Amino acid sequence: MAEQVTSARATAKTVRIAARKVRLVVDLIRGKSVAEALAILKFTPRGASPVVEKVLLSAVANAENNFDLDREDLVVSEAFVNEGPTLKRFRPRAKGSASPINKRTSHITITVTEK
């Protein structure tokens, strides 16, 4: 007997924003309904908001297309951010020296579940 799937997931990997900054946005939508989460993301003035919104819409699309779940019944059940690979660069400094610049990336994962 086939088990009824009630959740869908979407992931964005190696996004060029530090995980610490993305977590500030992701913490706002965890546990909210999809409609409420999209409204919050639309009016949150942070650089990570459009990226998180895109991942959320992808998770909703996965739920609708792959598992025939209804958009109005979906809730953001799980949302987390992990650190991705760090791009290491160097900035020239005085007297011929250089200092390291770490360009941090992150992996964003959002899971939506039916109420």
Swiss-Prot record:
GO terms for cellular component: cytosolic large ribosomal subunit. One of its GO terms (biological process) is translation. The keyword Phosphoprotein does not apply. Keywords: Ribonucleoprotein, Ribosomal protein, RNA-binding, rRNA-binding. InterPro entries: Ribosomal_uL22, Ribosomal_uL22_bac/chlpt-type, Ribosomal_uL22_bac/org-type, Ribosomal_uL22_CS, Ribosomal_uL22_sf. The keyword RNA-binding applies. It holds the Pfam family Ribosomal_L22. GO terms for molecular function: rRNA binding; structural constituent of ribosome. Belongs to the universal ribosomal protein uL22 family. Part of the 50S ribosomal subunit. PANTHER family: CHLOROPLAST 50S RIBOSOMAL PROTEIN L22-RELATED, LARGE RIBOSOMAL SUBUNIT PROTEIN UL22M. This protein binds specifically to 23S rRNA; its binding is stimulated by other ribosomal proteins, e.g. L4, L17, and L20. It is important during the early stages of 50S assembly. It makes multiple contacts with different domains of the 23S rRNA in the assembled 50S subunit and ribosome. The globular domain of the protein is located near the polypeptide exit tunnel on the outside of the subunit, while an extended beta-hairpin is found that lines the wall of the exit tunnel in the center of the 70S ribosome. This is Large ribosomal subunit protein uL22. The gene is rplV.
